[in-house]
């Protein structure tokens, strides 16, 4: 929403799989008159396939499919800027793997912590909110073999998913 509100020349595609989140996006788009935002009710990366070539992507949730999403984005544009928010330990652990698996430049991972001050008697005490991790980088076309790292990371992710489902295949 924020990016769509910055300029009418920017076109935003919001891919969302949860029906209640799609409805909220629609209400906000109408309320804020965001005619430059298209909402796609789909699961990523499948929802990305038919979209125009992106220049930037913000990933606010991956449903456990971060590497698949990034591979699709890389295939569409190996020069795009990526920003990923992470709150779960599983995604946080994946962020360093992402920076190692894909050919990137200016990769950075940072963590933000927010506190709210609550009054307790005559004291004002900070109450910590959950931290948010932010990973940002720009894809670059990799030297020979860099996509092998991506494929290896995807295979490892698939094997891990199969183990969780009790479907270990050798």
PLM feature segments, named:
Residues 8, 30-35, 101-106:
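Short helix-capping segments at alpha-helix termini
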Residues 10-13:
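Short beta-strand element of Class I
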Residues 15-51:
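S-adenosyl-L-methionine
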Residues 22, 32, 38, 65, ...:
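Catalytic, metal-anchored helix/loop core of enzyme active sites in primary metabolism
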Residues 40-81:
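Active-site segment flanking the S-adenosylmethionine/decSAM binding pocket
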Residues 75, 79-128:
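C-terminal substrate-binding/active-site "lid" region of AdoMet-derived donor-dependent transferases
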Residues 123-155:
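Core SAM-dependent methyltransferase catalytic element
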């Amino acid at each position: 929403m924020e990016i769509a509100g910055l300029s009418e020349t920017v076109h935003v595609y919001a891919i969302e799989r949860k029906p209640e989140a799609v409805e909220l996006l629609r209400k906000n788009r109408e309320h804020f008159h965001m005619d430059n935002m298209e909402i796609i009710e789909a699961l990523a990366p499948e929802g990305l396939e038919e979209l125009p070539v992106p220049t930037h992507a913000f990933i606010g949730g991956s449903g456990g499919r971060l590497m698949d999403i990034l591979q699709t984005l890389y295939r569409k544009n190996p020069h795009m800027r990526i920003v990923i928010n992470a709150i779960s330990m599983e995604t946080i652990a994946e962020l360093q793997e992402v920076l190692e698996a894909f050919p990137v430049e200016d990769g950075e991972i940072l963590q933000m912590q927010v506190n709210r001050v609550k009054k307790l008697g005559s004291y004002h005490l900070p109450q910590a909110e959950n931290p948010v991790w932010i990973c940002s980088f720009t894809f670059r076309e990799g030297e020979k073999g860099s996509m092998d790292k991506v494929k290896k990371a995807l295979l490892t992710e698939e094997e891990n998913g199969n183990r969780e489902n009790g479907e270990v295949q050798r």
